[in-house]
Every structure is written in structure tokens, then in C-alpha cells.
Amino acid sequence: TLNAGEPSPGEGRVTPSALHPHVTTYAERPVRASGRRSGEEAGTASSGTPSGMQFVEPTASLEEEIVAALPLVTRAQALLAEIAEDVQNNLNPDLERLRGVVSEMVLSVIRNPDALLWLLRLKRTDQYSYDHSLDVAAHVMIFGRALGLGEDSITSLGMAGLLQDIGKLRLPARLLHKIGALSPREYEIFKTHVDFSLHILAACPHATPQMLEIIERHHERCDGSGYPAGLKGDDVGLMAEIAGVC
């Protein structure tokens, strides 16, 4: 998400596990079996809570998938920069190409969820906001994969992760670059970025209702402490909850 402060409240092969033995990668980490049939969408109880998580065996090695995922990261960074420029020039951003890249990223995450994360750890630039947006998108897509969500839902999560804070471009620069906690008044202004994001994206033909709902609710919290609507419990929704914790 675009950065702003908030108030305080293989022999011979060098692998991630070999470099960092204390780190368990997503592909290595066991999760609770859901008991669902292969390929079945993650079930939810009436409350919208996922019935469980599932282990999905990677179909590509980390090394193979890094090669495939690297150009996706580069393309996504370039497209995010173009979208930011469009927004700053009061133009409607073109989401079609971004959705194409996100769809490819979803397939990469399904093949091996670790490759994208490792690339984002290594590929750091001065454009923190774009890297951070990609990091959020990668985590929500991987979370969706672990829950057994379908490709369309994971794509919506990825698009929302990349764009959910695009409205911060409409906020005063002094607010975004302030060091330290925001004052109560500044925080009220800061929270308007959600409405700005929705206003910017609602005019885009490729902004799906599911993506917009995730963006609208990703700062909501189940205890009602979030914003902008102070939603509680099931009203937040599973997809927005995923976006809110990543």
C-alpha cells in the first residue's frame, strides 16, 4: 500500500532454507487439512469464517519459479508507477494490463508461493510504496491460496492489495511524509484515502465489485474499531479480513 504513517496504538544449491535454517517457507509450512475435495473452493460457515486451511503441494521448484516470477515483479512495478502518474494527472488509470499481470502472479503463487516473496525481499528500490504494495499483494494472494480460494478470488485480492491505498495520492504530501504519529485531526483526514481510492477506481471499467468491496473494507476490524464505517463481525467479510491482516 502507498506509504503513510498512522497513529501509534539440493546439494550444491543455495536455497532459502539453507541460508536461513530458522525460516520455514510457505511451501514447507504445514497447514490444517480442510478435508475438501481437490480443487474445491474454500468452504465457509454461515459466519463467513473459512472451514479450514489446506496444504497445496508446489508444482514448481523455488529456483524455477523465481525465473518465471522475476519479470512479473518488474512489470507490476512499472504499471503501478504509470497508474500513480495517471491519478496525479486526474486521468482514469488503465487496470486491464495490471489485471493481466496479477493473473500471472496468481498462477505463480499457485505453482510455488515462496518465489514471489523471496523476489520482493531481494528487489528493493527507493520507491518503497510500490514495493510495499507488491508485498501486500503477494501476501494476500498466498493467504487466499492457503484457504483454497479460486483464481478469480485470489486475483481480486491481488488487485486490491496493489490498489487499496491509491487514494493516498490525493492526500496532502505533508501528511504522507510526516514522521511520528498523526494528530487526531490529521488522522481523520488520513482516513479519507479510502473514499478517494473508491472514487478513483469506480470509474475504471476493470474495477470489479469484489475488488472495490475489499478496498472499501480493508481497514474495518471485527471489533468495530476500524474505518470508515466501523463494521463489526461478519459484516467485514472474509476477503476484507484477509486484506486487513496483510
Name each region found by the language model:
Residues 1-93:
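Membrane-cytosol interface segments
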Residues 66-246:
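Histidine- and acidic-residue-rich, metal-dependent catalytic cores
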